[in-house]
């Protein structure tokens, strides 16, 4: 009987596939909303401190906040620094 069920089973409809994809997108956005309200201000302050020593483009600074569990938060900071000759003021 299982063989008969295999051949008679229907493929997923496009509506079901779209629903699953939408659920994934919503779940990803919910995770992104967990960043604290102070994060944009912190990014601005970090950029100001870095600019005191090295001239960098604000677009070259990437700050990501990730919640890992209830009591662990990770703040990841990536900066693309200019070449050594350009860093001197």
Curated annotation (Swiss-Prot):
BP GO terms, sorted: cell division; regulation of division septum assembly
Keywords of the record: Cell cycle, Cell division
Pfam families reported for this sequence: MinE (PF03776)
Coiled coil residues, start to end: none
InterPro entries with a match to the protein in the record: MinE, MinE_sf
Keyword flag Cell cycle: yes
Domain of life of the native organism: Bacteria
Family to which this protein belongs: Belongs to the MinE family.
Function: Prevents the cell division inhibition by proteins MinC and MinD at internal division sites while permitting inhibition at polar sites. This ensures cell division at the proper site by restricting the formation of a division septum at the midpoint of the long axis of the cell.
Name the UniProt record assigns to this protein: Cell division topological specificity factor
Gene assigned in the entry: minE
């Amino acid at each position: 009987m299982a063989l008969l069920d295999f051949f008679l089973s229907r493929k997923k409809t496009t509506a079901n596939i779209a629903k699953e994809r939408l659920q994934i997108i919503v779940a990803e956005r919910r995770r992104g909303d967990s960043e604290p309200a102070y994060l944009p201000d912190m990014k601005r302050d970090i950029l100001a401190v870095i600019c005191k020593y090295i001239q960098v483009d604000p677009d070259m600074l990437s700050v990501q906040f990730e919640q890992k569990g209830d009591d662990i938060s990770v703040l990841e900071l990536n900066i693309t620094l200019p070449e050594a000759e350009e860093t001197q003021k």
